[in-house]
Amino acid sequence: MAVPLTSSSFWSERSSPPPFSLTDMDRPPIRTTAATIAGKATRAALQILGRGATALPGLVALAVDPDAIARLSRALPHGAVAVTGTNGKTTTTRMVSDIVRAAGWAPVHNRSGSNLDRGLAAALLADATWSGEPRGNVGIYELDEASVPRILTRLHPRILVVTNLFRDQLDRYFEIDALARRLAAAIGPLPDTTTLVLNADDPIVAYLGNAHRGPVLYFGVDDPLIGGALGSQGISDATRCPRCHGSLAYTRVVLAHVGDWSCAQCGLARPPRDLAAARVVVGPASSELRIAGTVGGALDPVIIPVPGVYNAYNALAALAAARALDISLPTATRALAGYRPAFGRLEAIAAEGRSLRLVLVKNPAGFNAAISTLLETGRRPRILAALNDRDADSRDVSWIWDADFEALAPSITHAVVTGLRARDMALRLKYAGVPSERLVVVDGWAAAIRAAIADAPVGDEIVVLTTYTALLALRDALSRLGYVKQFWED
């Protein structure tokens, strides 16, 4: 049964962590040391070759010692914060990493977004000495939601954040109710020293709190002006109560099935928020939140330099994690004010006097959130849409027909389409109502970038809507064209 967090010590200032050292009992066993040496040697070789080294070193280390993640993490004095969910993982972990750094801590973070166990192991190796001793003192881990049940059998984080659960890659992931059951089964054995940080507005995520015997901290958006009626914010991925399977009712829907929900059949309802945005104002390049639920009841302003209501949720998740770490609100808000987007997450890249705004989209909910952000900021965008169908994207691209392009189509000034499934995307845009004279298919990543730039007047913004492997290819092309560094150099 979930235990609410009520400690009055939240938001107390945490000083810089004390110096630490490993005792002989804490030192990694010989097998972990061997795994560390093998992984770090692989990392060094890849770096000599100019490669990113964000996954393979971890794969090598785990082949030598399957417990390397748990053993390397165990030496971190402040424990680990793990962040999972369908959307928002990379942004939230970056925000948490910035916050703990602002508090004087030294995070170990899989910052590149490589979020399978191999990516997590690679990040730990990058931080560790050759003998396996950490240089950092707190882990900030982005975890792929399908991998969490396996990872949690070996790793017990101090904090586990779940951002949301939406329908995603149907050929790779379970349907969300099955995934939720697996997550609940993995959460059940966690010790009561682990704090869950859950999205109260997502009924599937909120119900995970019932699987945990330790503290649970809920966050959400309380602003009555954010959201609308059921069905107005995209296709819902969850219409049934996670407890009794009765129909859910909503007084306000923010996105898909996220909002102010309740079940008339069994009485389950959106839980009280420990941290909430009483007001959210979204601008073209930033958002302002007024935070309720802090000590004293004041509405504290929080500015984040990225637009979109979904980024308000990411910021709330990060602030809730900071609260669970006893990092002060002023420290956390200062860190968020200086936040710089991760690659592909509303990242802006200057090119020939234009700005390319990269937006990773991988499922209908994420696409609809991006579309909503474009519409609510009044843009008439020039689009570069890149659709791939590799394993990391989803082999099944039929999900693009669930994205609400019809809402965006009248605002599109021009669209360049590229990728392995460019013609599927072009057909989708055509059926959404984009006239053929405003739509062009361009094969080749660099050629598509050049075409989008050439079409846009100097000073204009090009919004790049891209799936994951297409993002990697576009980012590589942008690097080769001299507009940006490789993402692993960030």
Language model features with spans:
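Short amphipathic alpha-helical face segments that pack within enzyme cores
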Residues: 95, 119-122, 316-320, 369
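Phosphate-binding loop of NTP-binding sites
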Residues: 19, 24-220, 224-232, 236-240
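Short, surface-exposed acidic/glycine-rich loop or hinge patches that mediate macromolecular interfaces
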Residues: 86, 114-115, 296, 307-309, ...
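Low-acidity, Ser/Thr- and Arg-rich intrinsically disordered low-complexity segments
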Residues: 4-16
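Structural signal for short hydrophobic segments within the conserved structured cores
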Residues: 106-108, 217, 300, 437-440
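ATP-dependent carboxylate-amine ligase
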Residues: 18-47, 51-56, 238, 245, ...
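Acidic, Mg2+-coordinating active-site environments of NTP-dependent enzymes
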Residues: 162, 166-354
